[in-house]
Amino acid sequence: MTIVDVAKNLNLSIATISRAINGTGKIKEETKKRVLDYVKEVGYTPNAIAINLSKQKTRNIAILVPNITNSFFSNLVNEICKTFNKKKYNVMLYNTSESRDLEREAIRNIAAQRVNFVIAILVKSNYTNNPLKRLQSLGVNCILLDRDVENYTFNGVFLDNYSGSYEITKRLLEEGHKNIGIITGESTITSSNERLKGYKDAFKDCGLNIDENNIFKGKFNIETGEKAVEYFKNRNITALYSVNNQILLGVLKKSLEINKHLRLACFEEDDVIRALGIDVLACKIPVDEISEVLLQSLEEIKDGKTYIKPILIK
């Protein structure tokens, strides 16, 4: 039996169970007694690592990032480090390279260390057994960032992917573009699906039909952008919308002068592309606001708040 099972059987949060067992934090005496009586009855023995984490509070935070070469993620991590370092937190970075195997390995490493908080941008959104549940069972607090997950409830800070994508597409339509190609990422990632839905709904709300042949589905990587350029070569599109900057880099790698023929758009603004003077319609992601909201969420969890309603950054 794990602490997750105890929490589920008593219909309480993992954090509440942990506080009752370890005698830390604020908890009602009747709740504490109920927990202690139950664990004694079933013979539950807390994991030694979890006890160590609860009694030896650290200021160690781990960040899981799926692709540090993505300028959005690197800028975001840089801002998070600056924000948290000011508060004397130690930040450890794990780059999972969009690999579930590397993600599992990173989580195993985190579980073996004295880490109290994990900020996770997971590789996928659909898991049969979410790896973060392992960390929660050890008393590690987890906050999802950017990508939500299905069938699990975690604290989280997310971008408004739908609205941003809707506004980009609407702007292109207002500029007179009706034949707009879109390059999306994996359907197993919520942000990709939300951005595609924003694109489709913008067409619908403008009374226009969607040409499914103008949707190229791939991955959040440069290769997808390169393949998409070949795909759209004879599609007579006038605008091309990449749902992340890695895809856009692939588009430009295939044809650096493509912007002379097509109106380019990207969900995430890229500093390098902007510095090169390439005109791209894009959302400016408020990484400073995201890092401050993450810090605020972490402080609330430290103060005993076990669940924070997911926060949407517009």
Positions of predicted regions on the chain:
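N-terminal helix-turn-helix DNA-binding module of bacterial transcription factors
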Residues: 1-58
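Short beta-strand segments enriched in small/hydrophobic residues
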Residues: 16, 53-69, 179-185
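Short helix-capping segments at alpha-helix termini
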Residues: 86-87, 138, 203-210, 235-236, ...
